[in-house]
Amino acid sequence: MVTMSSPTDSSPSNSFSDFNREEQSRLSDEVRQLKRTNSDLGARNAKLAEMLKSSRDKLSVLFSQLEDMAQPPSVYGTFLETAKDGSNAEIFAGGRRMRVAVSPMLCAADLMPGVQVRLGEGNQVLEACDFEQTGELATLMEMIGRDRALVSDRSGEERVVKLAGPLMDRTAKLPRPGDTLLVDRKAGYAFEAIAKTEISRLALEEAPDVSYQDIGGLDDQIELIQDAVELPFLHPEMYRAYNLHPPKGVLLYGPPGCGKTLIAKAVANSLANRIGETGTSYFINVKGPELLNKYVGETERQIRVIFERARELAGDGRPVIIFFDEMESIFRTRGSGVSSDMETTVVPQLLAELDGVEDLSNVIVVGATNREELIDPAILRPGRLDIKIRINRPNKQGAHDIFTRYINDSIPLAEPAEDLIDRAVDHLYTPRPYVRLTLIDGSVETLNYHDFVSGAMIANIVDRAKKSAIKAHIDGTGVGLTAEQLIQAIDDENQQSEDLPNTSNPDEWSRITGRQGKQVTHAEVVI
């Protein structure tokens, strides 16, 4: 007989098991949820801690900036020297000299004479900065030992200053007289030598590129100046053997535009080429009017600087040419001044340089002027400007020679160069009255256009003709320079010259032509 169990016998235990499982599942879910929540809260906490740290750092920076802003401004001064006690420093700040303490954190090697230093609240040197880069300019007159210099400002006031660190560098070359220095007058220091010296503003120390072949119609004058200038430098042993001293100076004079400056440049170029590998020649080209200065004694000082520089360059046997252009502008006859007597001190300064106590070997002075009568006679005497070479206006053959320098096969020509030159010279020297001069004895002399020909005028004529040839080439009416264009250029040059001369001073006419003779009392332009 089979016994059947009642459903009520297992129902309570099953229900409890199901409940238990459900409860465990619920609790597991809660645990997992709590773990996730805990992880999120931990991440948030870490992020908040990081943000808090960043905020504290920023706050610290802001507090530091506020403290810096509350600090008094730094004062800067110029370091002069280390005090005798070895721990303090002598500085110049605020217009007064002070002895202050030096921060122990500062390297003593950084404190060089003349350097800018930053001071703290207690006037303690905290930092060494750079050297002053702005200030006043002064000209070095002469060195006083190794660390001091005598300088002069634009007003001519002289003072002694010390040299700052860069100028005291043993590996650097000391500044020389004539150099322009950057100075602080109050601190009494010179910080830097400006590269452009006073000499370089007035002179050109390299040889020009003009040769004797570029000069036409002056063969005799070129030979004279070669004998006077080049021979002593090229054959010094011969001069010593004959106990002959080279000339100290040469004067080139004559009408304007006839090649005086060109000859001086060609001499310097020839010396440079002939010396070549054995050395270098120097050409100091001094423009007379640039030496003039309104301050008393400034012109004389500049002349001294020029000759000091020349002696320095010539110290090792190299030839140096000092070329004074427009010489009459600064070396006029003493006592001839109208509003001033500047020449009474300028002329003696040049005389002292030419034949003074200091030796002037390997240096030769070449002067150029078209008003030689204005130059002081003491300069022109033998022993100073020994050689005097007159540069006359070119004659017909000389003009032909000058034309060949400008008209040759290197430019487009419509006719042979020789034919063009012959026709141009013939037309240029055809007698055509220009001005009638009445002399003091009553005689009358008529000057023609060709009496005023110069090398500069011929160069201008050729330039005019070349411009006409270019215009004809552009228009398609012709190619190359023609004789008609040269003749037209000569006529245009003569026509434009008619109204230019000043006839109010008749005596100037004889000087313009380069003639010496009787005094002119009246001049009349022939129309």
From Swiss-Prot:
PROSITE patterns in alphabetical order: AAA
Membrane-spanning parts: none
GO biological process, one term: modification-dependent protein catabolic process
Start-end of Basic and acidic residues biased regions: 19-33
Gene3D superfamilies (alphabetical): 1.10.8.60, 1.20.5.170, Nucleic acid-binding proteins, P-loop containing nucleotide triphosphate hydrolases
Protein name: AAA ATPase forming ring-shaped complexes
Compositionally biased intervals (Polar residues): 497-507
InterPro entries: AAA+_ATPase, AAA_ATPase_domain, ATPase_AAA_core, ATPase_AAA_CS, NA-bd_OB-fold, P-loop_NTPase, Prot_ATP_ID_OB_2nd, Prot_ATP_ID_OB_N
Assembly notes: Homohexamer. Assembles into a hexameric ring structure.
Pfam families: AAA, Prot_ATP_ID_OB_C, Prot_ATP_ID_OB_N
Keyword entries, A-Z: ATP-binding, Coiled coil, Nucleotide-binding
GO molecular function, one term: ATP hydrolysis activity
A GO-annotated cellular component: proteasome complex
Coiled coil: 21-53
Biased composition (Low complexity): 1-18
Family of this protein: Belongs to the AAA ATPase family.
Domain of life where this protein originates: Bacteria
Region spans: Disordered: 1-38, 492-515
Binding site for ATP: 257-262
